[in-house]
Every structure is written in structure tokens, then in C-alpha cells.
Amino acid sequence: MKKFAFLLLAISFVACQKQPKVEFTDEVRLPMTPIKNQGQSQFCWAYAMLSTIETEHILRGDSVHLSTAYIERVVKRRNLRGMGSTLLNIIGRYGIVSHDAYPDTSYHQLPQPKWVFMLGARYTPLEFAHSVCAPGEYMALTSNDNYPYGEEVVLDLPDNWEKNKFLNIPKDSLLAHVERAIRHRHAVCWEGDTDEYGFSFQDGIADGHFNTTPTDNHCMAIVGIARDPKQRLFFTMKNSWGTANPYAGLMYMSAEYLRDKTVAVFMTREAYECAK
């Protein structure tokens, strides 16, 4: 009970410390599907990677809105933890369907769809998955000084239970690749550490410089670049915690925070090549 009372006091203190809204100026803002709320689920990795794929297709002129409930249905008897690469592997094995065919409310109510209908064509979930995300289309990047740079490495993380490989590059190179990818109008899936004091969904901002090793605890899609009133560089993050913050669910992450607290990013190979 004392612990609960202390928690209430801490929450009240944080609420009183809410910062005034910072006015950001967009330099790049990519189109996106509506922001969702993952609730108590552990599926941030699915929300973020699907959002990245959706934005890529919107930029190509396709209207694609993918079902997170379908992914939850597929993995319900497996490990619920994962990374962006986990999502890519799952849809490569089991397919994906549209949000309209299997909305978020369907998980416990409707059977798993056998077909996807899109633009007058009929697909199996696996055929549809290959049409929205070709095998090998995305690549995974990390920056970890425990491994050699320039090599593909297996990150020793609980969420990487599939033992997926990541191209290991220096922090500054990773940051540059992310910025150039966004400026060339490609979405990026970000995975990293949101447990630092500089991260506040309530304020909609993640900022700070850190020397500590990042932990892997959240994923978001990067959908833009902006500047704060001091002309500092920020990345516009599409979160999956609903819309109850000053930016309707978006967050602004400083370049310094992203540089120091990134575990991995996922982008198309085209985005990586144009970002060289």
C-alpha cells in the first residue's frame, strides 16, 4: 500500500511538471495511416513495422492499411516479443491481411481470413504479404561497439529470439542513413530505449544525450524530420500509444537521443542505397 501511495504521489508530481508544448517546424512529413493504440499488448514491434510498410506504399501511390490483429492471432501461441525483423519473418511465413478485412476488434471475434480482396484482385494472405513486402526488401541496421563494424551480427537480445542478423555500422553513420532515408521520402522503423528520463509521451518529446548502453523496449515508425525553435534537428515518430499527447500521438525525438538510444532500425534496401 505504501508503494502504491508513493506511485500516486510520483504520478501527481509528474503531472504538475508537464512542459509547455514545443512548436516544431516540419521539414519532411511523410503520409501515414491513423495512429493506433496497442494498449497493454507487447506488439509495438508489429505496429511500428507495419506502419513503416504502410507509409512506403502510400508514397508509391498505394492505399495500404495492414492488420495488427492478424499478427496477434498468428503469434498468440508463440513468443509475443519481437523486433521489426520478427514482423517481416512472420508475414513472410504466414502472410498478412488488410485492416478492413481483420480490424483490431476482430482478434477474439472473427475467424482468420482466407482471402484478401484489393483493387479487384483476390489474394491469399501470403500472396498479399509478398505484394506489400517482397522477400529481402528490408534490411536491418544496428550500431554496437561490442561487434565489428561493417559486418552482419546477431544481437544478443531477448527480443531477437529468432537470431536475426543486423548490419553493424557506427552511430554517426546510422544517424546519417536514417536522416537521408527520410529526406528521400522513405519511412524507417526505429527500435530502442524509451526508459530514459528524456523520453516523455505526455510531452511528446524524447531528448537528451546519453553515454549508457540502450535497452530494447519499444518500437516506433519514423515519418518525418522537424526543427525546434532553436533549430535543433528532431525526428517525427509515429507511436502506438493512442493520441493523448500534444501532438495527437506523434512524438519528436532529437537527433542526439536517436543517436545514443537506438538499438536497431529497419529500412528498404532502396532507402539504404539512396542514403549512402
Please place each PLM-identified region on the residue numbering.
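Positively charged n-region of N-terminal signal peptides that target proteins for export
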Residues: 1-4
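C-terminal motif of bacterial Sec signal peptides marking the signal peptidase cleavage site
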Residues: 14-15
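Active-site signature of cysteine proteases
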Residues: 19, 33, 112-276
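N-terminal regions that are enriched for targeting/export leaders
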Residues: 19-30
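A short glycine/serine-rich beta->alpha loop
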Residues: 30-41
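Active-site nucleophilic cysteine motif
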Residues: 39-53, 79-89, 218
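Structural recognition of the beta-strand scaffold that forms the well-ordered cores
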Residues: 43-46, 70-73, 87-90, 98-100, ...
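Papain-like cysteine protease catalytic cores
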Residues: 64-127
